[in-house]
């Protein structure tokens, strides 16, 4: 008998710092991760950056897909990321033409 193992859903998220910089990451719990970043327990790149605002998040599938999607988004220019934030698509696919 085989057991069905439930794998968590992953999300891609983008945060904006008070200086307008955008930070992209992945997580299984967006609220928890935002709280970690805001309390200095998240990415070192965001420590001391002041208030953070969640400006975008979407379902990214499994961890492997989320990592690939995160890489693709991090390769975008700031203007392309801003367009993504403005458009607020519900889902993103690795194969999609990126902004």
Swiss-Prot record:
Pfam families named among the record's database cross-references: GIY-YIG
Transmembrane spans: none
InterPro entries: GIY-YIG_endonuc (IPR000305), GIY-YIG_endonuc_sf (IPR035901), UPF0213_domain (IPR050190), UPF0213_GIY-YIG_endonuc (IPR022992)
Domain of life, source organism: Bacteria
Domain GIY-YIG, residue spans: 8-83
PROSITE patterns, A to Z: GIY_YIG (PS50164)
PANTHER family to which the protein is assigned, alphabetical: UPF0213 PROTEIN YHBQ
Family: Belongs to the UPF0213 family.
Protein name: UPF0213 protein PC1_0597
């Amino acid at each position: 008998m085989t057991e069905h193992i439930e794998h968590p859903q992953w999300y891609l998220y983008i945060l904006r710092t008070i200086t307008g910089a955008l930070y992209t990451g992945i997580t299984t719990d967006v609220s928890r991760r935002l709280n970690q970043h805001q309390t200095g327990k998240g990415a070192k790149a965001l420590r001391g950056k002041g208030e953070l605002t969640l400006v975008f998040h979407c379902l990214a599938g499994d961890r492997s897909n989320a990592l690939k999607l995160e890489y693709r988004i991090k390769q975008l220019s700031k203007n392309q990321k801003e367009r993504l934030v403005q458009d607020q698509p519900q889902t993103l696919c690795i194969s999609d033409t990126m902004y």
